[in-house]
Every structure is written in C-alpha cells, then in structure tokens.
Amino acid sequence: MGNLKEILNSKKNCKSVWFMRQAGRYLPEFRKIRSNNNNFIELCLNSELSSEITLQPIKRYNIDSAIIFSDILIVPFALGQDVEFIKNKGPILSNFNLEKFLNNDRISFTKRLNPVYKAIELTRKRLDKEKSLICFVGAPWTLLIYMLGVKTKKNEINYEKIKSKRSEVKTILNKLNEYLCLHIQNQISAGADVVQIFDSWAGLLPTEDLTNYCYIPNRRLVEFCNKSNIPVICFPKGIKRNYKDFNIAVKPDGLNLDYEIDPIWAKQNLKNVSLQGGMDPKTLFLSDKEIQMNASKYLEAFKDIPYIFNLGHGLLPETDPDKVGRLIKFYRDYK
C-alpha cells in the first residue's frame, strides 16, 4: 500500500489505510494499560506508554500509518488550564483565565509537552521507516469551545456567549494559533511526518462565521505546515457542503470526510486534494457483508483518485477488533 506522506505530497492515485482512534478503547491491549492509569492526561504524558499504545494497532493489523497517542486538549493543559476526563461525560475544562492564558511563554509550554515529543521520538525509532507517523492538533475554534465551556449539549453551544465576546474570542484564537504552530513544529522535529488538524466542532458554526472562525485559522496552520514541507490533513467535521468552500479557502493536502458527506458529491466537488475517510464508524456494528457494502461505496467512488481509507470519525469503544481486521483485509483485497 502507498506511503501516506507520498500520497499527500504527490497526489498520486494510490491507496493507504489508517483509522482515527486506531489506538484506543476498542483494543483489549489498550484497556489493560488504561485500567492501571486512571488519569488520562498523565497517560498521554507517559512517553513510554504513549509510544506502546501508538504501536498497538500497527502490531495487530500492520496498518500503513501510526498516529501518536495523545489528545487535542493537551494544548489547553500545557497552557495552564485544568483538564479532566470524567467517565461517561468526557472532557471537562475549568478555570480559564484570559490574563494567565495570554501570559504563557513558549519555553514553559514546550517543557510541559516534552513527554509527547519524547513519545514521538521513541515511536519513530520503533516504527518501520516506510510507515508514516501522524501527529495532530485541534483547530483553534474547537479548542476554544472546550476552553470557554460554551457547549451546552452534545451538539449545541451557547453561541450568544461567543457573539458577546467577539474581541476576546479573536484574541484567544490568535494566541492558540501561535502555540499550535509551536506544538506542530515540536512534533515534526521529534519525527512526525504528517499532520492532521481536527476541527471537531466546526459544524456548530453558522455559515456566516465559518470564514473567520474556521477557514482562516485552519489556513494559517496549513501554511505553517507548508513552510516545513510537511503534508497536512484537515477534518472540519459537520460543515456539510461547506467542505467545498473550506477546501478552496484552506488548501490542505488532504481532506478527511465525515460520514454526512456523500462520496460521489465529494469526488465531483473537492478538487486538487487527497481525500480520506467518510464511512460511519457505526457501520462496524453491522454484519461483515453490510460493512463491506458500505466500504465499497467509498472504494468505488474514489478508485481513480488519491484516497486514504479511514472513517468519518474515530473508531468507537464498542467496536469489535476482529471486524476492524476483516475490514482492513477487505480493503487490501479490493480490486
């Protein structure tokens, strides 16, 4: 199968496979480690365990690329905010202080995240040289949603609070961009050779605010990666057909489709970019025949363009690891 970096750089018509959250709760070997490490942030900052977890799906499935085991919220944590992962509730961020946030310095930030960079160094040494090592960040808008605590329900935010603080929001986004670029550079220096930007809450933005809060911040990160000659994949989840405008404005090397995007529409409208993912992770709860039928929709639609086989979101904790293995085999055998 194709090397991920080569596909993104050259836009060659070849294929590759990896999955978001491929190192995670669906794997029994991960759950064994997690059961002995209650603090998720501390686990992310354990270089040896982070590297071991990163390589678990590589050892199990021989997947084409590894993605470092970490979390997008490691950045707010390194910038001094309290971050806690609560079972069955997810991440809770508290005690955001704008003055403290703006007074952070690059040296302290890097020092706090040195264990992440060490994990990347360890993983790069242990990973076959033909396999890519993906690092990642959350986009500024998505991080801001968590940092300000404006998400009221699973897919809703208090947008009036955002609108009432536009000046403060702009300041936070700009400062986040600065530290995200630093985090990206440090990860690249440690050995990562592909970057993915997760804008997980882009779909909560009204269309009229996508340019300022989604397109421009993502574009700045992409431009930074371009200067380092590192390919970058963007994932603006939930923006529906605004994917087309995003692609034109941001110009990423790769674009991860979410499960609401029709593959035929994507092929017709998303030009000069390698496509990735698309299939609903819940598909893996179905029978093998149904899984293969769904996978075929994407493999057939993208058979003559650069395509990275992945999902439209991360693998879910309830996923059967054996089904993941059979899906990878189906993909590799697909003609």
PLM features: residue spans?
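A short acidic, glycine/proline-enriched capping/turn motif at secondary-structure boundaries
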Residues: 72-75, 90-91, 140-142
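A gly/proline- and charged-residue-enriched helix-loop-helix capping module
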Residues: 88-126
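N-terminal basic, low-complexity leaders that serve as flexible interaction/assembly modules and, when applicable
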Residues: 1-85, 321-335
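Active-site loop segments of alpha/beta catalytic cores
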Residues: 112-335
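Intrinsic-disorder/low-complexity, polar/charged segments
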Residues: 39, 46, 95-100, 154-155, ...
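Intrinsically disordered, low-complexity regions
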Residues: 1-5, 110, 314
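Short, flexible, mixed-charge acidic loops at enzyme active sites
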Residues: 30-32, 81-93, 146-158
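Short, basic, glycine/proline-bearing loop/turn elements
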Residues: 32-44, 98-109, 248
